[in-house]
Amino acid sequence: MTARLRPELAGLPVYVPGKNVPGSIKLASNETVYGPLPSVHAAIERAVAIVNRYPDNACVDLKAALAMHLGSDVAPEQIAVGSGSVTLCQQLVQITSAAGDEVMMGWRSFECYLPIVQVAGAIAVKVPLREHTYDLDAMLAAITDRTRLIFVCNPNNPTSTVVDPDALVRFVDAVPADILIAIDEAYVEYIRDGLLPNSLELALSRSNVVVLRTFSKAYGLAGLRVGYAIGHPELITALDKVVMPFAVTNVAQAAAIASLEASGELMARTDALVAERTRVSTTLRDAGFELPPSQANFLWLPLGSRTEDFVQEAANARLVVRPFASEGVRVTIGAPAENDALLQFACDWIARTER
């Protein structure tokens, strides 16, 4: 007889990350191609010397550095730190939603939302996207007396789009004050074209808004797992009640602090990536691909039924991309040479398949 497990696990898939095939170009996981800056590397080396000690569970120094980085309006008690922003997503579900409660998100969106909600015994309410973008009006109409938490993934993963900043403010104002809104900004550093929302002001001026960010993308610390949340102090205290103790290591905290100190250099890297994003997007559109305007470090190719063929042929060309069955392909913007290889394959593929 096997151990009795929770029924919520039935049908729950195991998370499958982007593949890493030796010898191939990996454009599947939205990682930065850049390694740590020398100053960050040095901070990591120093922190390695104390890995025999437990880390600071309160992340005091990191919270202070984040408060300074985010601006004078942000205080350390308005910041929670987690082992990547995905753990903070999980904590938000834990502090808001019990069995039978509803957690809303646009769909398709970040894959981890669904299992986090399902494990909690809550109900995931998936509101279809409109033109590959969160449909805030439809989400507002879908709110019920059981809605406890709303995720707004902005930019949205995997479709790369952002909502209109003014529409986001109107949405926040219209949502009942007892429903928590989580603005998930893992890719916020890549937003351009005047589309950056004033999300921090929303979080600091309202008790039911929290902003999630991460060091995994633009800051290049995906392997160290550091994310953070900004919100009302009572909300932050609630998050701290359900955090896994010592989840953010000494090394991760030191690297994050050093990255904030070098944020100017790191943000220059995002400018270079945005330039590549523009180049790759333009070339793909000129070749005949339809894709929404990206404000992230990846592109969304809504290929529908042709998704599997594109992915398989890309693999044959030693390119690893991220498929979403029958919907499309997410392609990370890589180094220029990697992007050139992608463009050569993709332009050839569409020329052959659309004859």
UniProtKB/Swiss-Prot annotation:
It comes from the Bacteria. Keywords: Aminotransferase, Pyridoxal phosphate, Transferase. Its cofactor is pyridoxal 5'-phosphate. The keyword Transferase applies. Gene3D superfamilies: Aspartate Aminotransferase, domain 1, Type I PLP-dependent aspartate aminotransferase-like (Major domain). It is an enzyme of class 2 (transferase). Its EC number is 2.6.1.57. Belongs to the class-II pyridoxal-phosphate-dependent aminotransferase family. Homodimer. Aminotransferase that catalyzes the conversion of aromatic amino acids and 2-oxoglutarate into corresponding aromatic oxo acids and L-glutamate. This is Aromatic amino acid aminotransferase.
